[in-house]
Amino acid sequence: MKRIFLLAAGLAVAFAAMTPVSVAQTTSSAKAGGGQGKALTSKTIGSHADEVIGVFVNDANSQFATCSIDETIKLWSLPDGKELRTLTGHIGQVNNISYSGDDKYLASASSDRTVRIWNTETGAQEAVLKGHTAEVIGVYFSQDNSSVVASTSFDKTIKLWDWKLGVELKTLRGHSMQTNNVAYSYDGRLLASCSDDRTLKIWSTDAPVREALMTLEGHAAPVLTVLFSFDSKLLASSDQDGVIKIWSMPTGDLIRTINAHTGMIQDLSFAEDNKTIISGSIDGTVKSWNVESGENTMTHAAGVEVWSLDVTSNGNIIMLGCADGTVRLLSDSGNERGRAPKGGK
């Protein structure tokens, strides 16, 4: 879910007293040579003409999408990894993508300053949302409402849209630098954003509320990714220094810091168990972590900068978008559990 700009330099009442939040927590580090777990099989299934900076799997685990600096979006089938179609229309690199909760639509964010909505069955472009005054970096569908989507931008704002009506619902302001990513909680109550200002902000999804409910502090570098767990009880964030932080929700308590990678972390994804998180980095590795203990449970050397990733809900397949333009599937052939609805990204 990452983008090339990284290389350049009653809820409101309940949360009102919680800004900013900064508490004691546990720190863990990856050990050299540790956390290898089972060996994963890597398969390159196709490619874009340039870096692949976004990956998102649909809720049914039957399809995933990738986006690229080459200005295109590609749809792929699961589990076989067959390329289904290429979506074109953006006139700038496509920075991020998100499926709607019902899997019928895909939202994309681009440096052309637009958010576009696509029909995943036909490939038709359903809407073009204009309003940001700079590159659009993050995009995320509300998982309980397929007409509502959030976006972030270099213009420092978060915008909420009803794409079916073609209207901007509200603009959220508060970050002092570019906003990098956004995510809805899966219970539909909260929205999280992260920024180069090294903070995360938590917002209410209630229409009248425009002020941040809380600001989460603790990162020492620009925060690149933010993501809720399936059960909405945890929030994960990653930064340019290769650090992951785990926050308890809805309190905002910082419960764990993981010194995960030697390069910036381009993407994160929760597994369905709410206890496992997968990270990918420009250090060329993909790792899995137990969020309760901070243990590094798997390390895979991709041999190339990992720009984006996602994982099927049962954890059987990890999809990678890489700096060399390749799209890869990592799988554990010894773990063939049944499929379940996704919800961790």
What are these regions (language model features)?
Residues 59-60, 101-102, 143-145, 186-187, ...:
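Residue-level detector of Asp-centered blade-edge/turn motifs that repeat once per structural unit
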Residues 30-49:
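A short helix->beta-strand "capping" segment at the edge of beta-propeller domains
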Residues 67-70, 108-112, 152-155, 194-197, ...:
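Conserved strand-to-loop turn within each blade of WD40 beta-propeller repeats
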Residues 73-76, 115-118, 139, 158-161, ...:
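WD40-repeat beta-propellers
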Residues 45-52, 88-94, 129-136, 173-179, ...:
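WD40/WD-repeat beta-propeller blade N-cap
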Residues 64, 106, 148-149, 191, ...:
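Hydrophobic beta-strand positions that form the internal "hydrophobic ladder"
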Residues 78-81, 120-123, 163-166, 205-208, ...:
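Short loop/turn segments that connect beta-strands within beta-propeller blades
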